[in-house]
Amino acid sequence: MKDLIIVRGGGDIATGTIYKLVKSGFHVLILEIAHPSAIRRNVAFSEAVYEEKWQVEDMTCHLAHDIKEAEQIMKAGNPALMIDPNGEMIKQLHPIAVVDAILAKKNLGTTRDMAPITIALGPGFTAGEDVDVVIETMRGHRLGRIIKEGSAIPNTGIPGVIKGFGKERVIHSPAKGILRNICHITDMVSKGQLLAKIETPEGTIVDVAASMDGLLRGLIRDGY
């Protein structure tokens, strides 16, 4: 297929990239894992894995089960998504470019020989070695910068500060188990409010509470 770009990953930042590429006239195929764990699910095309299709603004991504179906979706002007964690479709379809938008903070297997142009978003890659170009994803003055030599700013592990709040904005699970959501994305919540429960392998229930007042921007899928 002409003007084909393959994007590895369909999370929120990947989705913004995909949206722009499709609007620019490219055919875009997204490769995802079988059970994506996007947090800002409402704006992540990876949700098509679970829902068969997912709309973000005026664009709808459709899950494809084979190459023929994917090509039909893309010819209609929509991004297609296939479950292909190892990138096997890259070898078969020979895209003009591969974009690693997994945002794993490390390279999970993307190489420069995958396509004439290879691009990676965020840290974990060296431009000129792992890929041709790295795009800075750290919020601030360098956000979106095109890096042709070197790497993006290393992951700090600390969320960006908004209105004086940083690490408080992200809540980590207090236990291993299955997530049972109580609140929903876009809910206004208060500090201490119950957001979800964790069902542990031992059969106990662990509460997950809000760490601050505010709007719930993201939440991993119920049952994950």
Tell where the protein language model's regions lie, with residue ranges.
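Well-ordered secondary-structure scaffolds
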Residues: 1-224
